[in-house]
Amino acid sequence: MAFFLLLIVSLLTCIGQVCQKQAVVSWQNNSTTKARKTIFWLITAIAMLGFGMLFWLRLLQILPLSIAYPMLSINFIVVTLIGQFIYKETVNVKHWVGIASIMLGIVLMSMQS
């Protein structure tokens, strides 16, 4: 149950972040529907982050904060991949070393002691 909730929280918060990025992209566009598109993406971002918070509150009833919060570091990995492959952002070697360090930390924290 905890893993499922963590997955939902992570997905919703990542989607919320991507919607915020899309709002910025829409705002920079010079189309006549710029404001409407931007508002759509901002409202969608707020909704995704709000639903993510509700699932997060449920997750905190199951897992200690000291375990649950670091597990959300997976979001750094997901958002970096989305930035690179969807928005064609450049990710340098230092960034990938940081991502690998985060992944190692997640693995270490998820291991039973």
UniProtKB/Swiss-Prot annotation:
Subcellular location: Cell inner membrane
Topological relation to the membrane, as annotated: Multi-pass membrane protein
Example of a GO cellular component annotation carried by this entry: plasma membrane
Domain EamA, residue spans: 42-111
Keywords tagged on the record: Cell inner membrane, Cell membrane, Lipid A biosynthesis, Lipid biosynthesis, Lipid metabolism, Lipopolysaccharide biosynthesis, Membrane, Transmembrane, Transmembrane helix, Transport
GO BP annotations listed: lipid A biosynthetic process; lipopolysaccharide biosynthetic process
Major site of localization recorded for this protein: membrane
InterPro entries membership: EamA_dom, Flippase_ArnE, Small_drug/metabolite_transptr
Transmembrane segments: 39-59, 62-82, 91-111
Pfam families named among the record's database cross-references: EamA (PF00892)
Superkingdom of this protein's organism: Bacteria
Molecular-function GO terms, alphabetical: carbohydrate derivative transmembrane transporter activity
Known pathway: Bacterial outer membrane biogenesis; lipopolysaccharide biosynthesis
Keyword hit for GTP-binding: no
Family affiliation: Belongs to the ArnE family.
Subunit structure: Heterodimer of ArnE and ArnF.
NCBIfam families assigned to the protein according to its UniProt record, in alphabetical order: PRK15051.1
Summary of the function given for this chain in its UniProt record: Translocates 4-amino-4-deoxy-L-arabinose-phosphoundecaprenol (alpha-L-Ara4N-phosphoundecaprenol) from the cytoplasmic to the periplasmic side of the inner membrane.
The name this protein goes by in its record: Probable 4-amino-4-deoxy-L-arabinose-phosphoundecaprenol flippase subunit ArnE
Species this chain originates from: Proteus mirabilis (strain HI4320)
